[in-house]
């Protein structure tokens, strides 16, 4: 169902109202930089599969991409080795556990299960093509820039803040390595993973990146193909299963769209063939998802009638 410009503008207003009225949550405080971001910021954007952009609020405020970066590194690696190899080497199942849990590793002989939780994302980072750590990082950054349709930058402040507190991720990497499921030097993989989470994006960027997936892998602004059309479906499937951490099932149940969140306060949701919705607000719920961004994206999707599990048209009784 294609949405008109007027319908999208009206949906943005509803999303803005829903986001601003949502209460609760607090900034992530285990990463010093994230704790310092003003908690009253709120931005919302929609980018369509044909390149139209709509936005409101602080949609151009730059914040840390954090775990949303996992989607695009997954796309990069999937292009390199294919979805079947990703499923074999990293996994393709929900864990039902917090994003930084090691329990799934212990229960499944060191296999991470999902590329959208920390263990799987570190394993995915270890599969990024490149002869050196810097080459691998540059490939990730170029991928993110291609999806966003503009030059993105690594925040040294965010990266340093994360590098000094990522002991848990280092432990995860060694567990992966001991099981043979980290495919490069484990500390190099953690370094690359940490850097990929430290890129600065805006809600408008995230909507463009999501719209690239909605458009079958082609950036609707630049026209550049970023991922094969055949790889989009498994990426969106992973987003559905694990995109909002332990709230992924509830999100699928209530909103019905593939989504991905990050502890920087961003959320991106994709309507295949149509558009992407993205929002930003720093205060998070206990699962690590932005309270206001979730409410805003859900309201926009509902206003436009975008739920992949809703039957449309005439149905025989």
From Swiss-Prot:
The keyword Nuclease does not apply. The gene is glsA. Belongs to the glutaminase family. The keyword Hydrolase applies. HAMAP family: Glutaminase. Homotetramer. PANTHER family: GLUTAMINASE, GLUTAMINASE 1. It catalyses: L-glutamine + H2O = L-glutamate + NH4(+). Its EC number is 3.5.1.2. One of its GO terms (biological process) is glutamine catabolic process. One of its GO terms (molecular function) is glutaminase activity. It holds the Pfam family Glutaminase. This is Glutaminase. NCBIfam families: Gln_ase (TIGR03814), PRK12356.1 (NF009020). It comes from the Bacteria. Substrate binds at residues 67, 118, 162, 169, 193, 245, 263. Keywords: Hydrolase. Transmembrane segments: none annotated.
